[in-house]
Amino acid sequence: MAAVPTRESLPYRDCVGIVVFNQEGDVLIGKRKASGDPEKSAQQGAPWQMPQGGIDKGEDPLRAALRELHEETNITTVSLLAEAPEWIYYDLPDDMVGVALKGKYRGQRQRWFAFAFTGKDGEIDVDTPGGGKHKAEFDAWRWEKLTRVPALIVPFKKAAYDKVVDAFGDIPQRFTHS
């Protein structure tokens, strides 16, 4: 019987997080689909989050952000606004270490990017992103105030989302005071 790995023995998974602002300065959030995955199951009480995903080996983080955004939402019409000044980390809760994230990671190390959505809402497709080429990760989406998002996500990601708000909190004013 294999021993359950300890938090200290596991690395962080390199990922990207994506903040998409619409013309009103609100951000895109998606409601996670229910599944048997322990991490996703833990999110059923607070299933909303912004798009995010893993960085492939050798992949540039900005390229990964654009790829993940398309794979999860079908969005391609964006322009880069900003990149968070540093990596943002979150740790899995103790009962999920060695189980969630395929049991290989203690949490995630995320590089966050902010984009302006320059398309129309009809471009957004979380049901069959990429024309059905990508597995749906969300079953609903909506626009929300950036400052409200940390209260809508799972508690173990809240501190990371607070840092995202700190990094990009001035961006909504660019839309409302330009």
Regions found by a protein language model. Give the residues of each.
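Hydrophobic (often cysteine-bearing) scaffold residues that line and stabilize catalytic clefts
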Residues: 12, 61, 157, 161
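Charged phosphate-binding loop/patch that engages nucleotide di/tri-phosphates or the phosphate backbone
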Residues: 146-178
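N-terminal strand-loop-strand
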Residues: 2-50, 62
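Unchanged
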Residues: 54-155
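Residue-level marker of positions within ordered structural domains that often coincide
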Residues: 23, 118, 166
